[in-house]
């Protein structure tokens, strides 16, 4: 079976969804920008040699509809002979895109794939056009479709206090801002055109969503966002709304050698699981355990984790049940996470994987694990190994 390697991984800055940098930039353009740039950064690879493009996107309507993967590849002037498909596993879409491409390569059905994902939550809101089947409540709790309430459920089940959530959210902003200031994101962020508050076109080199002034005290003053009576989850401890895209160049290790390209990481294992929709945020626990089992590793052997921060109330139970509470500051989301950077749904899987690979390089780490919860009760995880 072919070994699958990542030879490049980049992302756009994360723009605020409400009146932010990408308010006049379409999702297809964010995607095409990354596709063109991956090819420009790796001139040894002919675009025509790409076997397939897998692109994650959740809200596949309006500008994100009608197979945005193909639309973006055509805008990027990738040869018409290269196919492209849009992948949807809700929050895990672009990580699923990576898994789909990896399996094609492992089985020998492909040698080179471009993967990634995008979500413009300013142009296409998460709830746009959604119409849940009225009979769904016979099988799952109605609140299972309300992500904030599933986070409230997890916090109560696992004893996650409001103070713990506020502290974790403040940490996310502080670490993301420190990473920005130190240049830790420089190697993963591709400068991208957007518009400032006056409408002037400029290049953005940094994430617009981070709030460096965030404090536990300020967060503690916010009202509950989903359960106004007994709730503890606020807007400040939830993932920010942002627009962005991320992309990776994936190929067989043998093809990378032939092209003279240096692999940055190898995919060691992959896993996806289902869980109770009412606690959808718990999905990273069984997904991570399954990925670790497939890799022949334990959580203690993983040097760095990237766990998507849908909510502080959601990620803390996952950290606790993976036995990592004492290692948060050494291993978990060292450059902050989605609470500070936002969670553009179809982008996030590729985004956290890109951030993880860069962190592994900076720390000279051997193993890293990226994992996410998924709406309606799923989890997805990938174990990476430095080559």
UniProtKB/Swiss-Prot annotation:
Keyword Acyltransferase assigned: yes
Chief location: cytoplasm
EC number: 2.3.1.16
Pfam families the UniProt entry points to: Thiolase_C, Thiolase_N
Any single GO CC term annotated in Swiss-Prot or TrEMBL for this entry: cytoplasm
Annotated localization: Cytoplasm
Lineage top rank: taxon: Bacteria
Keyword tags: Acyltransferase, Cytoplasm, Fatty acid metabolism, Lipid degradation, Lipid metabolism, Transferase
EC class name: transferase
Gene3D superfamilies: 3.40.47.10
GO molecular function: acetyl-CoA C-acyltransferase activity
Subunit structure and binding partners: Heterotetramer of two alpha chains (FadB) and two beta chains (FadA).
Name of the protein this chain belongs to: 3-ketoacyl-CoA thiolase
Organism for this UniProt entry: Enterobacter sp. (strain 638)
